[in-house]
């Protein structure tokens, strides 16, 4: 059923995108939302009936982040928000796991964070747990108004309550449930902490096997024995630049 609905929805989105009038752009955006919703409902059904299958591959976490960011950057820019990426993993860190599942999780939560944030910034942090090199934590922090208790219920029962919205649309009611279910398929879970008026922290804990040492690429030591003076006002950005150097 999902495929049968997705095809006409995609056709509608493609046709609407060809219209030059302002109404055509609005129609195209609504059609894109419909396509995404059909795809997410199909995924939700597969997760619910346990027919979803994980696909393991070797991939770079940083490359995955570089793929996700362009998908959310236009929405971040049009709202005048800042985006910070703070990846504490090694530059060429390689992992074995379901790349597409992790991509979906990050995209869903970052899109939700953008919708619920009117001023400030969105931060994505990546850490390797001290207890095990195979366990990773992805944190998405926003400076929005916070997620309500009613919205939090969607983590366990999708569509049970309304989500907040901005001038561009509503936050995805399936985002929390799908992210948590996919994280559990990856050996972890989603944790959400929020403070009214201060923002929300989404913590995704997953298991991603580290690549064998012989598989990892040798880091280029281009800056060995080079002294660099960093003059950056923002402490967060200064720490990121210093660590990368």
Predicted features, each with a name:
Residues 49-59, 63-64, 94-96:
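Short flexible loop/turn segments at helix-to-beta-strand junctions
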Residues 186-193:
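Glycine-rich ATP-binding loops of the HATPase_c
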Residues 86, 149-150, 157, 164, ...:
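Disordered, acidic interdomain junction associated with two-component signaling
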Residues 11, 41-56, 121:
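Helix-loop junction within the histidine kinase core
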Residues 66-78, 115:
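Short alpha-helical segment within the cytosolic histidine kinase core of two-component systems
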Residues 121-133:
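Short beta-strand/loop element within the Bergerat-fold HATPase_c
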Residues 179-183:
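Detector for a conserved hydrophobic position within an alpha-helical segment of the HATPase_c
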Residues 57-59, 77, 82-93, 129, ...:
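Conserved catalytic submotifs in the C-terminal HATPase_c
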